[in-house]
């Protein structure tokens, strides 16, 4: 619907699929009656009967064909809504997780680190290799091994690299190579500090 004018209040549920900033404005215009559902991992539950179905993966037209089920998080205002959302979600996926709002917020933040920031790091690496005329295929095995460790939950124990080794000579050389990219340089410094802090004995 482009507008809630003339909305049928006898509907069982209304699925609000808009940007996060618009969700609660749209829900405020929906007449009382139907259960209200949104799809944001970061926003609170509706202030009326309903809930959240959050797909823990970006949905894009070019990735419509999936080799694995789309994981869905369910959070609801009450048991009745939770059951209804479960029935709806099962039409989409067999991989469901029931998380309360606090857990969902934590999961969303973890997803930003695991996916959004990770993807941005890959984009930086791809741009840097393009600028230095390196073939991206050089790094396929390295990236595959990194993600295999992540799937096993072993990322911390498998950490390698100059930051981990406190290799000052290499770190300084890398920072010198990033002088033309000040944002990347600051990110490099921050990531180096984070790695070294995480692996400093208590």
Give residue spans per PLM region:
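Long, contiguous hydrophobic alpha-helical segments, chiefly transmembrane helices and signal peptides
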Residues: 15-20, 36-40, 50-59, 72, ...
């Amino acid at each position: 619907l482009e507008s809630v004018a003339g909305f049928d209040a006898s509907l069982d549920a209304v699925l609000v699929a808009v940007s996060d900033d618009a969700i609660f404005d749209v829900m405020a215009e929906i007449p009382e009656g139907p259960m209200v559902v949104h799809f944001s991992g970061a926003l609170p539950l509706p202030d009326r009967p309903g809930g959240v179905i959050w797909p823990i993966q970006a949905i894009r037209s070019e990735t419509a064909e999936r080799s694995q089920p789309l994981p869905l998080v369910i959070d609801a205002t009450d048991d009745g809504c939770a059951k209804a959302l479960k029935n709806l979600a099962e039409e989409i996926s067999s991989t469901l997780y029931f998380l309360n709002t606090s857990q969902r917020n934590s999961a969303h933040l973890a997803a930003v680190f695991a996916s959004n920031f990770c993807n941005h790091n890959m984009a930086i690496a791809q741009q840097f290799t393009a600028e230095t005329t390196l073939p991206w295929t050089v790094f396929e095995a390295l990236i595959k091994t990194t993600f295999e460790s992540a799937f096993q939950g072993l990322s911390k124990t498998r950490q390698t690299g100059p930051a981990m080794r406190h290799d000052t000579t290499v770190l300084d050389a890398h920072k010198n190579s990033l002088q033309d990219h000040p944002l990347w340089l600051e990110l490099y410094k921050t990531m180096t500090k984070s790695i070294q802090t995480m692996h400093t004995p208590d």
